[in-house]
Design a protein with these regions (language model features):
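ATP-binding pocket architecture of kinase catalytic cores
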Residues: 1-81
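Short amphipathic alpha-helical surface micro-motifs
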Residues: 2, 37, 109-113, 130-131
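Short secondary-structure boundary/capping segments
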Residues: 9, 119-121
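Structured catalytic/translocation cores of nucleotide/phosphate-coupled proteins
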Residues: 20, 134-135
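Soluble or luminal CAZymes and related metallo-dependent hydrolases
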Residues: 39-46, 110, 126, 175
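Active-site Asp-x-Gly
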Residues: 124, 128-129, 135, 140-175
């Protein structure tokens, strides 16, 4: 997989830093207009292949079914808190959504009652490993191909549809 390899984790002045390998390439956001449609199609297919590979990873038995769960077992930055605070992990997808919508409903049961179709769709979605900031400023390209994906700090176990939320187009191009 085209991701940096972790070399070490160190604490300096009370802050933790992760040292990792460098991946060659340029940010997709900076090369977007210079790439042909065929090259962009290839890069999209390359990224999708990485996603499919991530989706084959399985949670550990003790964490099975949990969401908003980082690789280290902690919560993840919450979109309900403008990504400023960690939330989770939650024991289920529905519990996660209840906490994000707690100002709208009083319980998970009420959430299910008010939105049965949405609740069913949420409950049947797969829990997969998601890159929580997979946009063009974190995709590296070289010679018209994907060369790497960076900024994995907020990735973790989330519903598969979550990946759609984070893959918004952030290019300024007219293409």
């Amino acid at each position: 997989m085209p991701v940096p390899r972790i070399l070490d984790s160190i604490v300096v002045g009370g802050q933790t830093f992760t040292l990792m390998t460098r991946i060659s390439g340029e940010l997709l956001i900076d090369k977007f207009d210079a790439l042909s449609d065929a090259q962009l199609d290839t890069i999209i297919q390359d990224v999708f292949a990485v996603l499919r590979s991530l989706w084959t990873l399985r949670q550990s038995t003790q964490d099975s079914g949990k969401v908003m769960l980082s690789a280290s077992g902690h919560g993840l930055p919450s979109p309900a808190q403008m990504f400023e605070e960690l939330e989770g992990p939650y024991d289920s997808i529905l519990e996660c959504y209840f906490h994000m919508a707690c100002h709208l409903v009083d319980s998970e049961a009420e959430l299910r009652q008010l939105y049965p179709a949405a609740s069913e769709a949420l409950l049947t979605d797969a829990i997969v490993y998601v890159h929580a900031d997979l946009r063009s400023h974190n995709i590296l390209v070289k010679d018209g191909r994907l060369s790497g994906i960076i900024d994995w700090e907020n990735s973790g176990w989330l519903p598969r549809h979550w990946q759609l939320h984070v893959m918004r187009r952030s290019c300024s191009s007219t293409r």
